[in-house]
Amino acid sequence: MRLHTRPVRAYYPRMSRPRTVIVGAGVVGLTTAYFLARAGREVIVLDRDEIGDGASYGNAGLLSIGHYPLTRPGVSWRGFKWMFDRNAPLFIRPRPDADLLSWLWTFHRHCNQSWLDRCMKELCAMGFPTLELFEEIIAVEGIECDYRRDGWLDVVLKKENMASAEAEAKTLVPHGYSHTVISGDELRRRSPCFTDEVAGAVWYRDSAHCSPGDFMMGLGAACARLGVEIRTSCTVAGLERDRFGKAAGIHTSRGETIEGSAVVITAGVWSDALTRDMGLDIPMQGARGYHLQYEGIPQLPFTGCVLHETFVAVTPMHEQLRLAGTLEIQPLGRPWMRNRLDMLPAGAKRYIKGIEQGTQVAEWAGYRPCTSDGMPVIGAVPGTPGLFVGAGHAMMGMTLGPITGKVLSDMVMGAPPPLLLPMADPARYAINGGSSARYEGSAPVNGAPRETAGLRS
């Protein structure tokens, strides 16, 4: 990737108002664009794919505020144990890759209680504000996405696991979150779809769920109504900055330069390939997840669920049922592992009745961007004024998308953001304080083959 520099005057002669260029049309990119456009800013959003093709479409649809990061005590040891098990919930393909080995070591060092406590303080502070923004956008723009704020269930199969499930829920109480413990009999009275094997559940009352693809399409339409220009099938090859080192736009693989007074990188797992040449080296791995969607299942749960022992998410959407889950860390662009899709219904059948009676209507696989310390990267890039990044949310991207977009939009406009997020500060990954002199030799942001969306409903 070549970093272009030009005289500052070349960039702004025709710009009647500040223009922001956003790379990535996922939930973080589009919510950033939405809030900027509502404030009267000119915005252009670029994406190599279509709106709703990535993780913002394919996620489980659970807006689970107070969600734990990946860096939990014991997770790294389990990951190493599962490394050679292709059917494990977390599968890491062994390979002689220096970046992966460095990521694994850093990840392991962060899987401790002290780090988790610090992360949770910040992640929990983002929870209620992000749902308020979801509800504001949905109400103002009239988005029909089956949004329901009725919590989610941690459904437990084995009676001996109920105590640990409840203990985990209690850790969120000091942060203002509530929960209810439900017996298996009560759960079946509420939703007869649960099998007799289920011992009970912990009901996280404050969260919500929605159809993420419908939300994304509605959000994209809202952005367009506000004047946001959205260009899909547009590959970004590199960033531009002026002679003073300020971000000044991007250039595409077609040789086109798109000018802007600010640039926001929200390209998911591909973000680091762009930010690295601007002095920000984010240690990120793509963790592929899968979903299957069914119609015709006789009875659906009354709200979204996570199945405690198998880590499968189960979400009702418009009278259909989505099964989502698994983490698969391996090189970008490798073929799907069909056994990972098969794991979803296999992991759900002991909990939910009638899945075998449903008709599969969609399947999907895509990457969740996972940082080595478990926290997202949100804010200004040190050493390059006008450059911002919002990436690395792992499985929290859909949930935290609106609050991330609000924080980024306020930063772009020079306004105080609604939250201070020191744990998510990009400065922790700055190369020599930022703005590296390394301008040559990086892989293009779109170098990996596209991940297809599979069958779409």
Model-derived features with residue positions:
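Short, positively charged and aromatic/hydrophobic N-terminal segments
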Residues: 4, 11-12
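Glycine-rich FAD pyrophosphate-binding loop
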Residues: 37-58
